[in-house]
Amino acid sequence: MANVADTKLYDILGVPPGASENELKKAYRKLAKEYHPDKNPNAGDKFKEISFAYEVLSNPEKRELYDRYGEQGLREGSGGGGGMDDIFSHIFGGGLFGFMGNQSRSRNGRRRGEDMMHPLKVSLEDLYNGKTTKLQLSKNVLCSACSGQGGKSGAVQKCSACRGRGVRIMIRQLAPGMVQQMQSVCSDCNGEGEVINEKDRCKKCEGKKVIKEVKILEVHVDKGMKHGQRITFTGEADQAPGVEPGDIVLLLQEKEHEVFQRDGNDLHMTYKIGLVEALCGFQFTFKHLDGRQIVVKYPPGKVIEPGCVRVVRGEGMPQYRNPFEKGDLYIKFDVQFPENNWINPDKLSELEDLLPSRPEVPNIIGETEEVELQEFDSTRGSGGGQRREAYNDSSDEESSSHHGPGVQCAHQ
């Protein structure tokens, strides 16, 4: 006998774990004929078990998962599917697909309703300071007039079209001895499995068993919460007879801020300064997310390079559930250089005397050729990738024949 983790599906088909593909097919055909709903109307569940077992064991990938890991292998390797929860629960004593979707079974065995997911847009200020807000939602609740029965006592009858199952099973023959089972929601009862005569229906809910109700939730957005974090209201989703209500889940969506960008518990911002500030020190003020006016000072003599980053410790976002601890604030400096010809040429020599001296120009031996640096617009590209140099003696006619500007430095 092959060494497998579980044999329940093999036992359903009555074959050993090492059964070949032909043996599986032969066993399935025999059992499918015996328990076909047309031949044996009371064996619908048994037919589902047989079909499920054959579907798994006839698929090499699913069979390998099942052989190696048993139920757990199918649990983790399956993508889930509607209507399969009852089959797997009957075979293995537990749901396979319930945990994969929004609908499952609760601990007390009752079917669990779907969760209701709602986006909640919040500002960065809300996430920094915390916020309490009210959210109005519309949901289904059990009708109080009929206690969720849909009509007076005894008026509810089992749907004869689907025999109370809520679904209709259709069998399609693929080949002699091989059939495919398909199921769809019963149109007579809309999947309820029950019908109520129109004269006996509840006047308040019109036989629907539930009515719409407006629910107002008080939502607490705690300090330090993040984009994508969830706030859950357990059991507050739609109600339905015989079903445990699911949860209302609010998904936080952080709105873009005009000054700050968030990275975990840290904040980032960009600040523009002039050349004189970069060289001679500066002071500036900005408004933080809690309304405080923060003064930033940088001493004269300490140079700020273009694009450099400095940090202010402890001025980032508060930590979730530990709001007295905060991340850091990172400030990137955009140094704005003066425009061309901003100073009188006579003053340039005075400025040069104040700045660090130039590096010495090395002596060049041999012939040289002088070229001119021109302005370059990086958004226009480099002229189709052609390697060209802008020479000082280029004529207007020659320039117009080129496909774009020459290689130049970006103007600041």
Curated annotation (Swiss-Prot):
Q: Which GO terms describe its molecular function?
A: ATP binding; ATPase activator activity; Hsp70 protein binding; protein-folding chaperone binding; unfolded protein binding; zinc ion binding
- Which positions does the record annotate as the modified residue Phosphoserine? S78, S123, S394, S395
Q: Which residues form the propeptide?
A: 410-412
Q: Cite the J domain residue spans from the record.
A: 8-70
Where on the tree of life does the source sit, at the highest rank? Eukaryota
Q: Where does Zn(2+) 1 bind?
A: C143, C146, C202, C205
Enumerate the subcellular locations listed in this protein's record, separating them with semicolons: Membrane
Residues where Cysteine methyl ester occurs? Answer: C409
Transmembrane ranges? none
Checking PROSITE patterns in the record gives: DNAJ_1, DNAJ_2, ZF_CR
The cross-link Glycyl lysine isopeptide (Lys-Gly) (interchain with G-Cter in SUMO2) sits at: K134
- Which purpose does this protein serve, as stated in its record? Co-chaperone of Hsc70. Stimulates ATP hydrolysis and the folding of unfolded proteins mediated by HSPA1A/B (in vitro).
Q: What name does UniProt use for this protein? A: DnaJ homolog subfamily A member 2
Organism of provenance: Homo sapiens (Human)
Lineage per the UniProt record = Eukaryota, Metazoa, Chordata, Craniata, Vertebrata
Q: Which gene encodes it?
A: DNAJA2
